Structure formats: C-alpha cells, structure tokens
Amino acid sequence: AKENFSNKNSAAPLIGYVTPHVHWDRAWYLPFQQYRYRLIEFVDELLALLEDPDSNYPSFEFDGQTVVLEDYLEIKPENRQRIEKLVKDGKLGVGPWYVLPDEFIVGGEALVRNLQFGYRISEEFGGRCNIGYVPDPFGHVGQLPAILQGVGLDTFLFTRGAGQWVGEAG
C-alpha cells in the first residue's frame, strides 16, 4: 500500500510503502516441529485470505526464503497448486533465497549458491521476489550489494521494524 506523508523540511511529500510480509524462523527457541505446526496454521490462513475476493490484501511477501514452502508442502502437498496460482497471479511473493543466511557465517560463494537454489525453487512455483530480502541478520557483509546486483536484484530490504528512538530535541 502506498501512503503519502508530510515532510516538514520540503514541500514534496514523502512516499512510504507498506508491504504485508512475514519473517519466519524455522527454529529459534522452540524445536523445528513446533515451528512447523505454527507455519501450517499460518499458511492455511494466508492462502484463504489471499484467495478471498473480499479481502483487502492485494498481495503478501513470504519471508524471502523458499525452504518454508517445502516445510509446509511436506505436510500439505495438496495445496501446491493453490500456492503456485497465487505466485503466478502476483498475490504471493516467494524467494529469492533458499534459506535466509547469516551472512557472517558463510562466504560469498555460499550466498550466491543459496540465491541460485532459491531462484530455481521460486521459479518452479511461478515467479520470484525481485527484492534482496535479508531483514534479520546481525549486520551485512560488504560484498552483499555486489552479490545482489550480480544476480539481478537492485533493491534491498535490510531490516525489519522501526524503532521508537527520539532525539534530544524531541
């Protein structure tokens, strides 16, 4: 959704974009299967929402990693065609990664191969996200912009959420 905001330092309006999306941890502080149970519930509700003609959700961005599609479809393979249709119709964005990387643990080649694998899976579903979606690492490696550009991505979502910081002047 596109929103206009006033900018007190300029006559031109600021334009902000709101993209419904999710960040999904496959395993963090709970075992994988507990997260998968939550994933199944989430995706079931998401598919129903995106298929509902009366829904206000024009589209949804699914986390940037394709491995969650595999996790879901291992349990509910009958929904593959529903997901493919939503991807092809531009209602569900998938990829470009196979799994969201921790950039400081792996090297540049691993990042490229991760993207290549994610591209292949995304395209099997009918398309891929054209944004370098990496919102949750503990920083970004210096070569990431070149890697993203090298695979044809010119936009980068580098963090999620916005803090409530207020300067001394208020």
Positions of the model-derived regions?
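Catalytic-domain carbohydrate-binding cleft regions of carbohydrate-active enzymes
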Residues: 1-170
